[in-house]
Amino acid sequence: MVNIKINDVPISVEEGTTILEACREAKMIVPTLCYLKDINEIGACRVCVVEIKGIERLVTSCNNTVKEGMEIYTNSPKVRDARRINIKLILSQHNCFCPTCVRSGNCQLQKVANDLEFGSGTFKQHITEEKWPMDFPLIRDESKCIKCMRCIQICDKVQSLKVWDIAKTGSRTTVNVSLGRNIKEADCALCGQCITHCPVAALSGRDDKRPVFSQNGMLNTRRKTTVVQVAPAVRTAWAEAFKLSRKFASPERLAGALRLMGFDYVFDTTYAADLTIMEEGSEFLERLKHKEDYQWPMFTSCCPGWVRFLKSQYPDMVDCLSTAKSPQQMQGAIIKNYFADKIHEDPENIFSVSIMPCIAKKAECALPTMDSTGTGPDVDVVLNTREFV
């Protein structure tokens, strides 16, 4: 064990512990923007700097380890001034129009800036923008990127896809698709990990609310019968945004909220998930009868992100995938076929919406093969949990 002092409070931590982790163990708040434990510990944001007795310069706490007898100060005037300057520098290259930002109220940069209370004085802004294909389910806004490198590291070390990389040099350094490629050429699996770990709104899912909720959207114009399906994950996650208890945020209340929004019919995708299991199970048993005719093992095809990953990284194993559709697309096909017949409605006159936790679903619904009626997509629009709430 190593004995240290943090803000004059003596504590003991294991040898090799970073200063940041030691501070967190002692319940001392040290803000961070770029830090991800064991994934991104590069000290790029310089917001986690602390003062160490006997050392003139401030040090980053995320990638420096504790030493015996070290005395650390996390909130000295010198530290606070340095953090304010670093945040001001970051904001000088950041699009600060927060009211319309999808991450407003849930933005790490916004929180750190508010906590530091540095007033109105900022540096002259120099914001850069890059063109991006807005029809792609993953959207990158260069004007909001703070160069924390989280997306690069999470894609490299967790997903192993290496979609992102550092681009340009010097003061022009930024993050972009690796090898100068267009995102559509980068074999992105649309797993959403880079969006989840981005501390700001530089990365987000494509916003598809307009055709559903806008003044000219289907819920307001009532031009078609509107049907919505909800994924099991959304059923349990939607209440977090409203800080509702698990008991209060029941599936019945969710269905009621959707009906109040204007949807004519509400379905639970759990039903289609059961159909997927039955379909894949039956296919597996059929393959077992003729082992020599199939490539093994057999993989599920229920996740479009997984299917995209396999097709791009292991094309020789595509035949291992089940031929079954995902639950979303099975439910969409049921709505446009069986259900349309039950309510005596033309499939063309049904607007099918899916609320899912994954942006890969947005790409899946647009595949040309996902048209079981020949009248258009089985699922017209996919909304993620954030868009729904």
Predicted regions: what they are:
Residues M1-I4:
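Short structural boundary motif marking the start of a folded domain
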